[in-house]
UniProtKB/Swiss-Prot annotation:
Motif position, Box 1 motif: 273-281
Protein name per Swiss-Prot or TrEMBL: Growth hormone receptor
GO terms, molecular function: cytokine receptor activity
Biased composition range(s): Polar residues: 414-433
Organism of provenance: Columba livia (Rock dove)
Major location (coarse): membrane
Gene this protein is translated from: GHR
Species classification: Eukaryota, Metazoa, Chordata, Craniata, Vertebrata
Length: 611
């Protein structure tokens, strides 16, 4: 027991010491607030602190100064506003000029504050609060009232010097929390759905419209419906339903239901949320081959099935065609019908078929950019190329035939009696060198062409396999020989290719007649009897023209024994995998006509006359 008393004594001593220590803390005098109730006057209040020697009246002074003043001034009224206050009436109040105030004791300053009057406006509380009953509900449980009050008597609200907003707060008598309504300018505020069996407390406060600080609350107004003679009727509606318990039990039941559904449909939900990964399966291929990495066997299976081939591989058309090698070394030394068809002149003339097709047998045409339905441009190209080809081939055959005849014949008969055919004669100067006869040049050129004649004799009897007779099921083209074309006219090679060294610009008439006579057709036209050409005689264009016309007339009278048949040697377009469209070569063009002119024949005119 003694120990307990000792401990209790120590606790009391410690408590007294703490209280005395807190009392010993010095609190300096401080300005508590400054307020203007009506924006015309204002007052400032302060506290003395715990300085006992400063509690006497007049010990602490309040000094003030406006912005434009230079000296501090003492408070004009310490009595009107109460103890420890200073009142500034309208004569000392300037609304738009800032003030500075401070608490001093002789030379010691305790507190200082600066402000303007419009910032410290705190209106007085409203007065004369009252309420009236508006109506009650049909059940008699709730009622509506309207609360009224008057503005503060100090605020000049009626003249508009200051505008006030009012805030109403109410609560039940037994509650601690006040319910607030939105601030409004009106002095009448309705309250709805108040319970008739309860008593309420109402209070109101105001503030300046441009300020955020409210003034003091008014006196509390008590509202009791029993005072108005309204009896409270207990009703079943007043009994509160335990909504909170209903919400709790409902949430628990819903959670249990969801859990049961998840447990019963676990496998199906798992399939929906996490679908199974499909096993790699290829029709006709064992998945174990892919797992073991046997790619060679998989590739062999894929290659053996057409279903795994690409669409382009299945739909691609392949056309077999005839490949012609124009540079075969075995064929260079011998002349054949293939060389004739595929000679350099022939290929050059066919600009459409001049390049070799190296597309590995894929379906193609010599004119890939030209549509199949438009044959105008391609036909023109083929026709022109065929005409040039036929002319060149015909000229070469005629030259060979001419050389053959020259070699077989012993000699050309000399042209005699040229004096009787030429009306005009002229003699050469005696000092000029005699011209070698034209026939001598022909005889000199004959041995050089004899070797070609032996090789070309077989060419004239060679058939050209240029006609398509059949197309095999495999797509190959069967060619058959065409009809032999007889050359209707021959041309001497030495007349066009041999160059003469001319001493002057005229020619012997006998030499020219020899050349013209050879040009005529050898099969139907008889040989022209040659005359001996005098070295000192010349001919004119009239005699040459007469001879050319007579020879041309005799040639025209004798028809050609065989009409040349065109050979289809140019592939125009691939019509289908088993069809070809060929172009025909053009027929030979007529011979050149002699120009009718008078006078002697110059070298240029002779070149024009000689084909």
């Amino acid at each position: 027991m003694d120990l307990r008393h000792l401990l209790l004594t120590l606790v009391l001593v410690c408590a007294n010491d703490s209280l005395s220590a807190s009392d010993d803390v010095l609190r300096l005098p401080q300005i508590s607030k400054c307020r203007s109730p009506e924006l015309e006057t204002f007052s400032c209040y302060w506290t003395d602190g715990n300085f006992y020697n400063l509690s006497a009246p007049g010990t602490i002074q309040l000094l003030y100064m406006k912005r434009n003043d230079e000296d501090w001034k003492e408070c004009p009224d310490y009595i009107t506003a109460g103890e420890n206050s200073c009142y500034f009436n309208t004569s000392y109040t300037s609304i738009w000029i800032p003030y500075c105030v401070k608490l001093v004791n002789k030379d010691e300053v305790f507190d200082e504050k600066c402000f303007s009057v419009d910032e410290i406006v705190l209106p007085d509380p409203p007065v004369h609060l009252n309420w009236t009953l508006l109506n009650t509900s049909q059940t008699g449980i709730h009622g509506d009232i309207q609360v009224r009050w008057d503005p503060p008597p100090t605020a000049d609200v009626q003249k508009g010097w200051i505008t006030l907003e009012y805030e109403l707060q109410y609560k039940e008598v037994n509650e601690t929390k006040w319910k607030e309504l939105e601030p409004r300018l009106s002095t009448m505020v309705p309250l709805y759905s108040l319970k008739i069996g309860r008593d309420y407390e109402i209070r109101v406060r105001s503030r300046q419209r441009t300020s955020e600080k409210f003034g003091e609350f008014s006196e509390i107004l008590y509202v009791s419906f029993s005072q108005a003679g309204i009896e409270f009727v207990h009703c079943a509606e007043e009994i509160e339903f335990p909504w909170f318990l209903v919400v709790i039990f409902g949430a628990c039941g819903l959670a249990v239901t969801v859990i049961l559904i998840l447990l019963s449909k676990q496998s199906r939900l798992k399939m929906l949320i996490f679908p199974p990964v499909p096993v790699p399966k290829i029709k006709g291929i064992d998945p174990d081959l892919l797992k073991k990495g046997k790619l060679d066997e998989v590739n062999s299976i894929l290659a053996s099935h057409d279903n795994y081939k690409t669409q382009l591989y299945n739909d691609d058309l392949w056309v077999e065609f005839i490949e012609l090698d124009i540079e075969d070394p075995d064929e260079k030394n011998r002349v054949s019908d293939t060389d004739r068809l595929l000679s350099e002149d022939h290929l050059k003339s066919h600009s459409c078929l001049g390049a070799k097709d190296d597309d590995s047998g894929r379906a193609s045409c010599c004119e890939p950019d030209i549509p199949e339905t438009d044959f105008s441009a391609s036909d023109t190209c083929d026709a022109i190329s065929d005409i040039d080809q036929f002319k060149k081939v015909t000229e070469k055959e005629e030259d060979l035939l001419c050389l053959g005849r020259k070699d077989n014949d012993e000699s050309l008969p000399s042209l005699a009696n040229t004096d009787t055919q030429q009306p005009r004669m002229s003699t050469r100067p005696e000092n000029s060198q005699p011209w070698p006869p034209f026939a001598d040049s022909i005889d000199a050129a004959s041995p050089s062409a004899h070797n070609q004649l032996s090789n070309q004799n077989s060419l004239r009897n060679t058939d050209f396999y240029a006609q398509v007779s059949d197309i095999t099921p495999a797509g190959s083209v069967v060619l058959s020989p065409g009809q032999k074309s007889k050359v209707a006219r021959a041309r001497c090679e030495f007349c066009t290719e041999q160059n003469f060294t001319l001493d002057n610009a005229y020619f012997c008439e006998a030499d020219v007649k020899k050349c013209i006579a050879v040009i005529s057709h050898e099969e139907d036209e008889p040989r022209v009897q040659a005359q001996i050409c005098n070295e000192d005689t010349y001919f004119t264009t009239e005699s040459l023209t007469t001879t050319g016309i007579s020879l041309g007339a005799s040639t025209a009278e004798t028809p050609s024994p065989e009409v040349p048949v065109p050979d289809y040697t140019s592939i125009h377009i691939v019509h289908s995998p088993q069809g070809l469209v060929l172009n025909a070569t053009a027929l030979p063009v007529p011979d050149k006509e002699f120009n009718m002119s008078c006078g002697y024949v110059s070298t240029d005119q002779l070149n024009k006359i000689m084909p």
